[in-house]
Amino acid sequence: MPDAFAELRHELAVANRILANEGIIDAFGHISVRNPKDPNRYFISRHRASELVEPSDILEMTLDSKPVVPTNVRLYSEMVIHGEIYKVRPDVNSVCHHHAPSVLPFCATGVELVPLFHLGGTLGSKVPFWDSRDELGDTNLLVSTPEEGASHARALGPHYMLLLRRHGASLAGTSLRECVFRSIYTTRNAELQLRALAIGALGPLSPGEVEKCGGHNLGPRGVERAWEYWVTRLQKAEAMWAAAGLPRMKDLGRIARPQTAGLTPARSAPRRVARAASKTRARNRR
């Protein structure tokens, strides 16, 4: 039977690998996307490191974070992060949770993360904190129960980024590609803030600048341009892996094309990828 969501599963697998390739997600972390035909369901990978996720790993879940089709495969322990946000935020169609090194100092100290450059406008007007101790006392710091997931979702409120004390960050987007865009550029903003603090006083964006920068950067042309760039970087990385005899994801290039009407479809880079692989094989023979 044909899979009506084959393209979506493929794109979600690519999103996982992009976030790994860009250093946002390592062995731990995950990203999901809401079912575009049924808002009471979402898609997410089985329990696996994002760098290794394949379309066949993608499962469909209810908003209670239970598999739609019963399965014996292992699931992420923090699925409720996704399901509970989808329950209370109908505007959100993608959720990412990560522990990027640049955001962890803010999680450890409680220092506010503020937008400092134009692409940092994707932070939004405020980045709230969630401290699980406030409602739940001592825990293992994972968000793994419905109660913890609901508390986490309440802390996010109407915002698009949440910092978890002593843990990491959760991001939301109106689309999968927007969520990837926000996940990457909010970590870049965190890197900038850490460096800027070593030089002098911060000069954050004004509320008006945040609104205008965020609206511009998250428009279709900005998101699609960045997506094409990240897919190309991933193609090059996977070509190097293939040259070294490591497995790579099939049909990666086809997902680089923009989804927005009026945009010129992205050209794949098979020749560049082949040349990179050839050069690597030549070096390995020396």
In which residue ranges do the predicted regions lie?
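Glycine-rich flexible loops
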Residues: M1-R286
